Amino acid sequence: MQTYGNPDVTYGWWVGNSVVTNRAGRFIGSHVGHTGIICFATGASCLWELSRFDSSVPMGHQSSIYLSHLASLGIGFDEAGVWTGAGVATIAIFHLIFSMVYGGAGLAHSLFFDPDLNEGPIGRVDKFKLEWDNPNNLTFILGHHLIFLGVANIWFVEWARVHGIYDPALGEVRTIFPGYGDFGMVWGHQFDFIKIDSLEDVMSGHAFLAFLQISGGAFHIATRQIGEYTKFKGDGLLSAEAVLSWSLAGLFLMGVVAAFWAASNTTVYPTEWYGEPLEFKFGISPYWADTGDTSDCKYFFGHTSRAALVNVQYYFAFFCLQGHLWHALRALGFDFRRIAKAIGGLTESTSS
């Protein structure tokens, strides 16, 4: 974190990042604990939505964001192809169980394991020690992150190929065989990917991402800093604050893209599960508005699940952008206390 040259800076209890900034073991503990919170929220929310589900009202007009995602993945259908919520409770309970496992692992890493990863029962554990100004260390850790993301993409593609996902064009769950190596499709959808209307193209894109991420991960793990570590390459800038700002920038980008995609694409976000496509409007601030009849929407203040999902993602992305700018400027050395002092000076001169 930025200290502005003060080696003895202290942080308030609310600055949680300060506890894990230079403690790789605790950093892992916080990540695993956060995963546990996400798992618990997912399982609990899924059970809550299932308990309130009314089959006489379209799913997209209920408070059913989690059920909508499961239905899109082809989960919850009976043998006749009708969505009944079959197996959804089991998935939710598994999430609750795993949330306890993740929570216990997070506490173990925080309380019992080496907080700095200087030593451990597994060899080479010190390679994952956090050295924020060491490009070799950061690129090594980045490589592993990319490989895990690539594996997740493969898992999704194989799920669609083996189990199948919901195809709104047919109104049923079907298996999707991606075009492995179809780079022409990816190139052709660079600027109109939001309008994709083929699940084969969607899965091909994920297969391409898996290839790209795993290749990039292997490259980052195998390579080291090339040439002299100059200011152009990040010397003096590379820090925990800078990495945090880049992470927030990534969340901003993904949030905005997801918002625009979910608002208009009915292939990946079917109307049956999320409600009608949205319209982008301007008021006090930009927002997404429903375009269909919402008289039967009892939740989300009378809006569809699509409207709730998109607007929350859109505004979370906006605040991630503000966080990115804040931490990026701090990483560059800008002291925001100067603004408060300048305002205080103007106030004093005005009053005098």
UniProtKB/Swiss-Prot annotation:
Keywords: Chlorophyll, Chromophore, Membrane, Photosynthesis, Photosystem I, Photosystem II, Thylakoid, Transmembrane, Transmembrane helix. It is found in: Cellular thylakoid membrane. InterPro entries: PS_antenna-like, PS_II_antenna-like_sf. GO terms for cellular component: photosystem I; photosystem II; plasma membrane-derived thylakoid membrane. GO terms for biological process: photosynthetic electron transport chain. The keyword Signal does not apply. The keyword Metal-binding does not apply. GO terms for molecular function: chlorophyll binding. Induction: Transcription decreases slightly upon iron starvation. Its cofactor is divinyl chlorophyll a; divinyl chlorophyll b. This low-light-adapted strain contains 8 pcb genes. The antenna complex consists of divinyl chlorophylls (a and b) and divinyl chlorophyll a/b binding proteins and binds more divinyl chlorophyll b than does the antenna complex from high-light-adapted Prochlorococcus. This is Divinyl chlorophyll a/b light-harvesting protein PcbH.
